[in-house]
């Protein structure tokens, strides 16, 4: 793949129909294509799941952002709404793993994630761009959601280049002007970098990048019937990206009993109390904070 010249940038909003910031940014950009114009860059915007956006629902039948496993994309027996929509997007933006596009997938979260880039691979191009963005925008954090021997199923996994942008906290189904504008700025900073690459320039970069590497997901306490038995502990609520040490409070049961983190080392939880993850059995994702040096 030629990383000295980005063929096309694709910005996807509304992959989840109740995440309105990405949807309305894409609508805005599509109304006036001059907004994203860079002389050496071609940028297109599209809505990931138009039907779900119309209904202001995360999805119609299943989570679109878990439908991009290669075998599933090739399996024409899978005919639920999002499984079909994934094949449409794959046709437009793929083929998965070999696409020359740079993909930005816009999301929002009810968790206190600030501005997060979610990387789904280790491509040096993405790490360099992430370092550039954290340097120019110190609010930006970088989360790498890779798991050994496990294929990623996100929209953003269609292309080697690019990532998802996850912003929060924001309730589902609404807009917040502050996060809307911060996301828009981040998109412009990304395009500025890509424009420099296409002009043949090498934007100056910091030598290291701080990233939060995915470790594992943690479920809520449950009864033997699988019913919720507790909530995020008030001392943990909203503390995404803050260190959680062994013995720190993590959940509060409905009987007012505090449950403590029983791991053996410090972790950095994120996606704490994300509304869409209750059905997935995810109360938070644990990460390890690390500094990596850039080559
Ligand atoms: Zn989302």
UniProtKB/Swiss-Prot annotation:
Substrate binds at residues 58, 65-66, 166, 277. Its EC number is 3.5.1.15. Keywords: Hydrolase, Metal-binding, Zinc. The keyword Hydrolase applies. Its cofactor is Zn(2+). It catalyses: an N-acyl-L-aspartate + H2O = a carboxylate + L-aspartate. Pfam families: AstE_AspA_cat, AstE_AspA_hybrid. Binds 1 zinc ion per subunit. One of its GO terms (cellular component) is cytosol. InterPro entries: AspA/AstE_fam, Aspartoacylase, AstE_AspA_cat, Aste_AspA_hybrid_dom. Zn(2+) binds at residues 16, 19, 107. CDD domains: M14_ASPA. The keyword Transferase does not apply. GO terms for molecular function: aspartoacylase activity; hydrolase activity, acting on ester bonds; zinc ion binding. Belongs to the AspA/AstE family. Aspartoacylase subfamily. NCBIfam families: PRK02259.1 (NF002601). PANTHER family: ASPARTOACYLASE, SUCCINYLGLUTAMATE DESUCCINYLASE. This is Probable aspartoacylase.
């Amino acid at each position: 793949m030629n990383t000295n010249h980005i063929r096309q940038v694709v910005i996807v909003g509304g992959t989840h129909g109740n995440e309105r910031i990405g949807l309305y940014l894409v609508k805005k950009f599509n109304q006036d294509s001059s907004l994203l114009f860079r002389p050496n860059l071609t940028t297109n915007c599209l809505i990931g799941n138009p039907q779900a956006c119309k209904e202001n629902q995360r999805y119609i039948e299943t989570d679109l952002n878990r439908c991009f496993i290669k075998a599933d994309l090739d399996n024409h027996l899978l005919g639920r709404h999002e499984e079909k929509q994934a094949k449409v997007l794959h046709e437009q933006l793929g083929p998965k793993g070999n696409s020359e596009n740079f993909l930005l997938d816009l999301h929002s979260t009810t968790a206190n994630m600030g501005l997060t880039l979610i990387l789904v691979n280790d491509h040096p191009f993405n790490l360099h761009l992430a370092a550039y963005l954290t340097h120019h925008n110190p609010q930006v954090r970088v989360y790498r959601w890779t798991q050994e021997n496990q294929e990623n199923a996100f929209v953003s996994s269609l292309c080697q280049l690019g990532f998802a942008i996850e912003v929060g906290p924001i309730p589902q189904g609404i807009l917040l002007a502050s996060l809307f504008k911060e996301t828009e700025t981040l998109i412009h900073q990304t395009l500025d970098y890509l424009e420099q690459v296409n002009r043949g320039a090498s934007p100056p970069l910091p030598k290291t990048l701080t990233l939060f590497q995915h470790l594992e997901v943690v479920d809520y306490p449950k009864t033997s019937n699988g019913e919720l038995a507790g909530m995020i502990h008030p001392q943990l609520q909203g503390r995404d990206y803050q260190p959680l040490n062994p013995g720190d409070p993590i959940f509060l049961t409905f009987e007012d009993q505090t449950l403590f983190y029983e791991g053996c080392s410090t972790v950095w939880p994120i996606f704490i109390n994300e509304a869409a993850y209750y059905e997935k059995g995810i109360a938070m994702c644990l990460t390890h904070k690390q500094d990596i040096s850039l080559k």
